[in-house]
Amino acid sequence: MRERHLNILVLAFLAAVPLWAYVSDEPFTITLSTKVAILALAGVGLNFALGLGGLVSLGHAMFFGIGGYAMGILASHAQSYTPIYDGLFVFEGTKSMLVIWLVAVLAGATAALVIGALSLRTTGVYFIMITLAFGQMFYYFTISWPAYGGEDGLSIYVRNGFPGLNTLDPIQFFALCYGILLIVLYFFWRLERAPFGLVLKASRQNPLRVTTVGLGVYRIQLIAFVMSGAVTALAGALFADLNRFVSPSMFSWQTSGEIMIFVILGGIARLCGPVIGAAVFILLEQILGDLSQFWHIYLGVLLLVVVLFAKGGLTGLITRRGAS
């Protein structure tokens, strides 16, 4: 099977499952499909940095959490009718998804710019540890932030609004998240084939040669890292809206690891790799989670098998077998 055909099949299946669930009156299945779409979006965000740029970040949960808390803070102040800031100017909360997304993306991009500017001056294990350290800093900061729930997190009692849609309707909220996923996947596909994407992949494979021809590896990787942080923050805002709850766990290293697993399982640098990885992860969580609280052991075995024997992840495994 060609990878293009597999991508179409995966995206069609992701759209078909909630439609079937809607007809069958299974709202929980629609919610699971929405969760897959949102987590896949977070994986696509990491794929910008890891897949194209070779930047192994173990702190991407910080962008996921930044997006989530951007939504939580804005929405909580909107529902309590209190301003976020009341000084030289008044900064109020909002229940508009469009405004929340804009704030989340800008906050994620800004954080990625600052953190990337520092961490990209290192390589290898040093880069990995710096991103992990920043992620843990955000995690412990939110734990000690009592204004927004501290370690207990922050509950949001309303679903934020989008023009023309009833976002409380599970199928409509899924359609919104699915549409955003398609847009970001299309952007990833175009970027991979654009001159910037080609240079970014070249900087991953041979940074010295890229520098020799007069192209700045640091600047190129920083741009990719910022885009990666922005997309992951958008996913965090959607995830918070789905659950109507944010907590410090969104910043934890476990969350960073899960986002990494989505990409590795599905296939690093593969267009729909994060979609496949997120779907498999959620499926295992639902099926094996009911059988044993230690279901992560089975996930670890699967991940080990994929890393050792399936070059290109599950995407590479399926397309290779189809071609043979």
Give the residues covered by each predicted segment:
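Transmembrane alpha-helices and adjacent helix-loop boundaries
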Residues: 1-324
